[in-house]
Every structure is written in C-alpha cells, then in structure tokens.
Amino acid sequence: MNIVWANPEKNIEQAQQLIQQAGISDLYVLPEMWATGFAIEPEGVAEDEQSSKALAWMRDFALINGSAICGSLAIRTSDGFFRNRHYFVTPNNVVFYDKHHLFKHGREHMFYTPGDSPVIACWQGMRFLLQTCYDLRFPVFSRYGRAGEYDAIIYVANWPSSRQLAWNTLLRARAIENQCYVIGVNRTGFDPNTHYEGGSAIVSPIGKASDSLTAELSLDALGKMRDKFRVLDDRD
C-alpha cells in the first residue's frame, strides 16, 4: 500500500480498492499508520480516537463483511496522549495494542506514549500476537509463552528500503524461533523522508514465505508440527 501522506480519506479509498483486488478473506491486514503515513510529529496529522474516520471505516468494514481487519493508526486518545495504536477489529469487538518499542532513531518516543505489554487478539479460533514495526527487532518481547500463547504474529510496518534485508530476515526468524505463522505487512512508495519497498510476507512456522500475499493458516498443521518437534518446551 502506497500511503498518501496525511490523507485518511484517500487512504481509506485505496484500502478499499486493495481489499477488493484481494478477494474474500477472513482477515485483512493493513500497514502501520496506514491512514496517514508515519507521522513522527502527530499534531495536526493524528486523528482523535473518538472521531477517527479510519477507525470508523474499519469497524464498518468488519461488520458489513463479517471479516476481521487490522492495522495501526496515529491516534490521540481521550487522555490527550498520542499513540501508535494497532487495532484488530472484528464484527463484534475491537482489540488494540499500543506500540511498545518506539523508534528512538526517528524521534517517535518524543511524541508518542508507548504501550506496556503484548496483546493477543482471537479470531475464528486462532490467536494473533499484535506487534508493530520496530518491535520486530526485539525477540524477547514476542517470545512464545513470555508474551502469551499464540498461533501467529502480525507485524504492521513502515519499514524503509534501506533496511529491507533486516525485515526479510527477522520475519523468518520470529516464525522459526516461536514455531508460529508470521504475517508481516509493510507499506510501499515514498513519504516526505523515506522510500519503502514493501516486502510484505506470510511466513510458515518453518520460515518459508508464501508465494502469495493471501494464504490459509492451518491450526491443525501448526499443532502437529509443534507436537512433533517440541522446541517450545525448551524455550528460555
């Protein structure tokens, strides 16, 4: 998704078009700050949570289509703080995770309030650990068992092309070490400062990336693999 800078209306239109192209699915994943681009200085760009057009659209989409949809938004919460909030929206529920590892190299920590702990969202029997961009570099935070028990990790990102190799490598590492599926969704295009190459991927628990950006995640296959090769029993 090539995000239009600071334009939720245009990005909602674009998200709708991409979803139509993807076809029917149980879960759709959008990038980090998909409605605005990566707004380091959120004043005048971030939406108020109570009146967010992007969040309202996510709620409506989930309800109308009977699907789940997730992605992060630059949000001002009712306490007046800005948060990089990863929403997981289903027809009947909204779960959110506030990005814990704020990107100090880009001054994100100067404007946003971090979350305290991992969050797991459940949908159609599958447990998804919600993560955002820079979190990918910190394996202890997402460690299976320590972060909770889950079946898949979702990383939404604005990960620059200059560090693309790290993105590709770490997605596979998180899948292998936690014996789980990993869904990594990164934006494409340009913002005022950075180029983004994309590289979105769906990675199997053995580290193999799908040839398509649409995939079926099998709880049965995951359970059999974990039972046969019990790496998680020996985790730190």
Locate each region found by the language model.
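Cys-nucleophile CN-hydrolase/nitrilase-fold catalytic domain and related Cys-dependent amidase chemistry
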Residues: 8, 16-90, 96, 161, ...
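Binuclear metal-dependent phosphoesterase catalytic core
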Residues: 204, 208-233
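CN hydrolase (nitrilase-like) catalytic-core segments centered on the catalytic cysteine
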Residues: 53-70, 137-213
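Active-site catalytic loop in hydrolytic enzyme cores
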Residues: 47, 77-148, 162-163, 169, ...
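Hydrophobic residues at beta-strand termini and immediately following loops
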Residues: 1, 97, 121, 185, ...
